[in-house]
Amino acid sequence: MWDETVAGPKPEHGLGRLRNKITTQPLDIKGVGEGSSSKTVAAVAGSPGTPTTPGSARKENVWRSVFHPGSNIATRGMGTNLFDKPSHPNSPTVYDWLYSDDTRSKHR
């Protein structure tokens, strides 16, 4: 599926030809320095190189907290202290609040 509004007319053969072209467009810079000037900027189609990272640095497992929420000792009891225990003896629990008549979803 090709969207002509966003991408323009569909190419006849393939996108490989489009990637190899170098496009130049004039860039007008006005009000910078003395007077106005026009410069041409060449944009090369393609992707930039991948930055290198040091191999000796150990990466932290970013998914640890998602798949093992209780693995962080500093935040282990945070959820139970905040959400599972009511702050006042007569205050509703999360379940009571979600399914009470006032706050329950009317969509059926």
Curated annotation (Swiss-Prot):
Recorded family membership: Belongs to the DRM1/ARP family.
Induction: Circadian-regulation. Down-regulated in axillary buds within 24 hours after decapitation and then up-regulated. Down-regulated by the transcription factor ERF114. Down-regulated by heat. Up-regulated by salt, cold and dark growth conditions.
Gene Ontology CC terms, in alphabetical order: cytosol; endoplasmic reticulum
Protein name: Dormancy-associated protein homolog 1
The keyword Phosphoprotein appears for this protein: yes
Segments of this protein annotated with the region Disordered: 28-59
PTM-bearing positions, type Phosphoserine: 47
Phosphothreonine sites (modified residues): 50
Source organism per UniProt: Arabidopsis thaliana (Mouse-ear cress)
Signal peptide boundaries: none
Tissue expression summary: Expressed mainly in the low bolt.
PANTHER family: DORMANCY-ASSOCIATED PROTEIN 1, DORMANCY-ASSOCIATED PROTEIN HOMOLOG 1
Presence of keyword Phosphoprotein: yes
